[in-house]
Amino acid sequence: MALQYVGLNEINGSLVVLDHVKGASYDEMVEIQLKNGTTRSGRVVQIEGEKIVVQVFEGTNDLSLENTKTKLLGRPMELPVSKEILGRVFNGAGRPIDGLGEIYAEEMMDINGLPLNPVSRVYPRNYINTGISSIDCLATLIRGQKLPIFSGSGLPHDRLAVQIVKQAKVADESGKGFAIVFAAMGVTNDVANYFKRSFKEAGVMERVVMFLNLSNDPIIERTLTPRCALTAAEYLAYKQNMHVLVIYTDITSYCEALREFSSSKGEIPGRKGYPGYLYSDLASLYERAGIIKGAEGSVTQIPILTMPNNDITHPVPDLTGYITEGQITLSPELNSAGIYPPVDVLPSLSRLMKDGIGEGYTRGDHQDIANQLFACYAHVQDVKSLTSVIGEDELSPLDKQYLSFGKLFEQHFLNQGFDANRSIEETLDLGWDLVSVLP
């Protein structure tokens, strides 16, 4: 029988402190009962001897030092999962908010996940088709990969996320279907409604599991959202043998919540005030992508983050780049030119692309046309720099041809619109058509 503790030593923001507590575990769930009989949930976030610090999910309003009762539940936070989670909408802590009732759980899964034995991992191969030429051809998303999107303020990363959810599909019939887990952190009501409305209008909601943490929801819930989403993905992938694509936005909001949470605990800050363990915390999310031996399913991740002031050296994109396998970078200049999606292909990279394309996966000429497009577009940038110095009239005929190629590439290859869903064959054929204008 669990012990119940009466009274609190201290209340500090969303944290409460208890003393003389025996046998508490880090991340253990706590039930907090108010004087009026209502209950709230929390978890242990710090232990010093017999003193523990508990983060209260619903906040500490109306809690009193004398009359609050606290009970340690002896388990970490768990997510109820079953096949019924498909098509459902949850809040950031995994509670249903779509009015369709509770989930009848087949099992309860620890949201922190199970550590994957590195030896049991299978090397990611085969690709996920997004229907977006700049990604499918030049920064191909490989099944089991973690490939972030680096965006900036005012760029259409939300539209791009919706388009990927609408169009993404696996290239073969292995596994028992394809599902998408979508997690939004720190978004406004308008953006959350846009996501829900877009998925329903596109008719893809039955294959989507949504987790929505709004900007006015508790900070602690924001730190739980990606873990709940990844737990749902692992259940679908490893228990239901489905291929799962996890898209979560915005990782920067998550990291800012982590910074605020760390500050409230009085921890020593690191770069730009973020906690010193930011790297390992992000790794605990990103490294849950992959394929394991004996399972037909897979977990693929597309974390979306906004770079403050478009600074790629900011701690969040910087550390994300160390952990993940490439990045897709969005360009403010292309966006200003009316090009959608504004993917800047030169700094974009998929490190696993070489092993999931070509004969038997996409098409035998995929790597060749990708190399050609990269080389030609890189030369276009050199010619543009030269043009700014000597003017277009002084360029050689060959350089003028490269400028023409650059305009065609941006207007017809990169720019494809929100509703265009190109197959890999259409994308590769279009690439060959474009390079044919060059000698």
Where in the sequence are the language-model features?
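Phosphate-binding/switch loop-helix module in NTP-utilizing enzymes
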Residues: 138, 221-258
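P-loop NTPase nucleotide-binding/switch module
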Residues: 68-70, 77, 84, 96-146, ...
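Loop/turn-to-beta-strand initiation segments
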Residues: 146, 177-180, 206-209, 239-245, ...
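Acidic-enriched and Gly/Ser
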Residues: 1-4, 10-130
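Conserved catalytic/coupling modules of large nucleotide/cofactor-utilizing molecular machines
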Residues: 253, 260-439
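The Walker A (P-loop) glycine that initiates the GxxxxGKT/S ATP-binding motif of P-loop NTPases
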Residues: 151-152
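Conserved catalytic network of the ASCE P-loop NTPase/AAA+ motor domain
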Residues: 140-142, 168-176, 200-205, 235-240, ...
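Conserved P-loop
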Residues: 155-206
